[in-house]
Each structure stands twice: as structure tokens, then as C-alpha cells.
């Protein structure tokens, strides 16, 4: 008998559950939890990538870091080691680079430096990611509202994170659908 191929064009409940599970319990290390001692380039890249493991397209390479240093987005390493402040900046960059230009990322950094410390800015970023990600991934039914009096930096941060996390969600959905499609030829072959 002839068996037709089934191609998934929408997500079934199991796929939705797997995508939602990506967001369950997600958290970023706070500024005080980032290594206080400098890290070499490979260690820096490994640490940043470990924070976003499981999210396709959210990754950093050594050449990207070198490019960000060359363009002045982050400062030069001291004795080839990257500081806590640079790690925090790279964690922000790796998430936002898919939705903002480097020029706009630099502008946001300048705005934040004018109003708060690197630790405060980074911890606000972490809080906002952890607020938005579960909601967008369907693991939470609510999201904290922005204060109506929130400054421009907070509004721009929220907008950046909502856009970036929506892109992460879409990438996870499409990966799940492709994985499902890849299973069908083997399953159908077993039925013959």
C-alpha cells in the first residue's frame, strides 16, 4: 500500500510542550554571580553560550567578540581577559543582536551608562528577560507591566527584549517542526 508523507505545518500539543519547556526555569546569572576574575576569550564565549543553551540562533563566537572589541562596542580585554562588565555586555549583545544593529546597541549602552552602573543595567536586563521569556513561550499567563512613568531606557529595554524573545520563540518553534518532519520518513519506513 502507498503511504503518503505527513509534513507538519502546525505545532501539535507535544511540540508546543517541548517549546514551552525551553522557557521553564530559565534564569540568567546576576552581575554578582558572574566571575570576578577575568576570563580568556574561549572561556568568555563558553560562559555566554552556556546561558542560552537550548535557544537556536542565540550564540557567540570568538570572532564576534573580537569584532565587538574592534568596533568599540565593548572595551579591550586587559591582559587578554574579559571582565565581569564585559561579560554582562556580551550577554546583552548576544540576545539583542538578532533584533538591533550594533549602532543601536551602542546607543542603549551609552544611555544606560548615563543613568546607572553596569551592574544595575545588567540586572535590570536579567529581570526583564525572565519576566518576558516565560510569557512569550507560554509558560506563564502574565507579564509584569512597565511602570507608566518608566524612563526611555526601560521602555527601550522592554521593546528590545520582547522582540528578541519573540525571535527566540519563533526559532524554537521552527526547529521543533523541522525535527518532527525529519522523524516521519523513518517512522513511515518502519510501517512498510
Regions found by a protein language model. Give the residues of each.
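Intrinsically disordered, low-complexity, charge-dense segments enriched in Lys/Arg
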Residues: 111, 115-192
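Basic helix-turn-helix/winged-helix DNA-binding cores
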Residues: 3-113
